[in-house]
């Protein structure tokens, strides 16, 4: 399993919580069952899911700030959760270069989203990484 596969698992959990109303604790338990001995990637997936959910309100403020003409709830469910997870990486995972977070999100969008998902995700995240300090105030003091 790679970090990309860990991101895929994290996306599945975020989607279940967001769209299916799954309990995060139960979702984590189900996610953990699929990792077996691959603890390094399990920890990364848990970090992405836990961090994204913990900072969801702030992350959604950033998305709303960038996509002024799009209500976040009107975005495709998969795209919304990919963007949320990527923004968690961008603002909270200092060891991951922005370009990696954006590229991984675009690839997830191409795999799991609609025909235009990759382009849409790249557009949203691209605007943010061009000037992340513009959006950082929306993140500060953000635990929801």
From Swiss-Prot:
It comes from the Bacteria. Gene3D superfamilies: NusB-like. InterPro entries: NusB-like_sf, NusB_fam, NusB_RsmB_TIM44. Keywords: RNA-binding, Transcription, Transcription antitermination, Transcription regulation. GO terms for cellular component: cytosol. CDD domains: Terminator_NusB. GO terms for molecular function: RNA binding. One of its GO terms (biological process) is DNA-templated transcription termination. Belongs to the NusB family. Involved in transcription antitermination. Required for transcription of ribosomal RNA (rRNA) genes. Binds specifically to the boxA antiterminator sequence of the ribosomal RNA (rrn) operons. PANTHER family: ANTITERMINATION NUSB DOMAIN-CONTAINING PROTEIN, N UTILIZATION SUBSTANCE PROTEIN B-RELATED. HAMAP family: NusB. This is Transcription antitermination protein NusB. The gene is nusB.
């Amino acid at each position: 399993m790679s970090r990309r596969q860990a991101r895929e698992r994290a996306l599945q959990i975020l989607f279940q919580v967001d769209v299916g109303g799954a309990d995060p604790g139960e979702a984590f338990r189900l996610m953990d069952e699929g990792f077996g001995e691959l603890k390094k990637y399990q920890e990364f997936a848990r970090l992405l899911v836990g961090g994204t959910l913990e900072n969801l309100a702030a992350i959604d403020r950033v998305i709303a700030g960038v996509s002024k003409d799009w209500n976040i709830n009107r975005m495709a469910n998969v795209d919304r959760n990919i963007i949320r997870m990527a923004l968690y990486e961008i603002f909270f995972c200092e060891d991951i270069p922005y370009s990696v977070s954006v590229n991984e999100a675009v690839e997830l969008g191409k795999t799991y989203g609609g025909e235009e998902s990759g382009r849409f995700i790249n557009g949203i995240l691209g605007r943010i990484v061009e000037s992340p300090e513009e959006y950082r105030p929306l993140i500060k003091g953000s635990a929801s």
